[in-house]
């Protein structure tokens, strides 16, 4: 049986995104939530309350390193500049501080680690995160090439091999279609990709479901795409198509039972 994990990124960013993701989990195919903890306190607390109210525990850390809020949002250039100029100690301090904040807020270690902007493609950061996940038996998202483009199609074989040698658990495949207005075309692309997976392999699909309010429209680079992904997550035909391909919906935390 093939495993499919469907992760909703950007939880905690705005209330509208929080509410859309909760619906995508409780009524749709989303299995795991990637939580940002360096967001505006009001939006973060709103998200944490919803997790508690709905008894949702499959929550991982969506590493961002910088504060993301209504009036402050880093761009790719900020990350490139940071990794170019920061010392190893500065990167480690910022990364471990963010992990500690997740543990403090959630009251548990993250069920998985995933990055904003593919930043785990930076090998200095990757080594820090790998040390943490190995020590705590936590899966990671497959690393991709670093933050140069919106899509995450570029493989990062050196980073993958490094993690595999350490014994870090990852899915066998990672699929995402971040941009695009044609919902049906994206659905068919996902199904085509899923159809190529071998039995007993695992896949993570990344979605960005959410509602749009004024704050989200003004502060996020993804707007229509969030409504599109919420529609995909709630589509019963899409869910059935996936199951007809031999998939069972699972969680990142289940990867520790995967050989």
Each language-model region and where it sits:
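DG-centered beta-turn motif at the end of beta-strands
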Residues: 8-11
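Terminal accessory/targeting
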Residues: 1-5, 15-57, 63-106, 112, ...
